[in-house]
């Protein structure tokens, strides 16, 4: 999985307000302000990285191939978080769960099996996924 470190990127784009997902609202047809995406989605720039997704193990969480994950390495993973982990030397993205006193990496796709985290497993929680950037499409 390619890791893209975050530099001192600053990109400000026009922010046009809200958009109705139900009935259209012509009252919002004006420019409100400028929105800096890096300030909106990145809370800790020095510990935030982008990773490109491969595979379908997290499609139930809305994470698809070629999506970009925004990952904050300064956050401590909590049960329920989607995390990037290093498992046996390989990057993987899964949901971090606790069930019955045990911790698992749980895929969000029934075609994949949850991974029980135990002392003999080479595992490191690498960071917490804070945002997912993807195109609006269906698989």
Model-derived regions, located:
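Aromatic- and Lys/Arg-enriched surface recognition patch
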Residues: 92-120
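Short, hydrophobic/aromatic-rich segments at coil-to-beta transitions
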Residues: 48, 78-83
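Hydrophobic beta-strand signal
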Residues: 70-71, 84
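Structural motif
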Residues: 66-67, 81
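Short, positionally conserved secondary-structure boundary motifs
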Residues: 1-59, 90-91, 98, 102, ...
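Short coil-to-beta-strand transition motifs
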Residues: 65, 87-92, 123-124
């Amino acid at each position: 999985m390619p890791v893209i470190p975050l530099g001192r990127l600053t990109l400000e784009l026009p922010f046009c307000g809200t958009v109705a997902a139900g009935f259209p609202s012509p009252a919002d047809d004006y420019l409100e302000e400028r929105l800096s995406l890096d300030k909106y989605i990145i809370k800790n720039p020095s510990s935030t990285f982008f990773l490109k997704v491969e595979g379908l193990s997290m499609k139930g969480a809305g994470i698809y191939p070629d999506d970009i994950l925004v990952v904050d390495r300064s956050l401590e993973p909590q049960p329920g978080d989607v995390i990037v982990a290093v498992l046996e030397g390989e990057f993987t993205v899964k949901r971090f769960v606790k069930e019955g006193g045990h911790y698992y990496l749980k895929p969000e796709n029934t075609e994949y099996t949850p991974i029980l985290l135990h002392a003999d497993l080479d595992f490191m929680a690498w960071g917490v996924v804070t945002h997912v950037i993807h195109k609006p499409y269906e698989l």
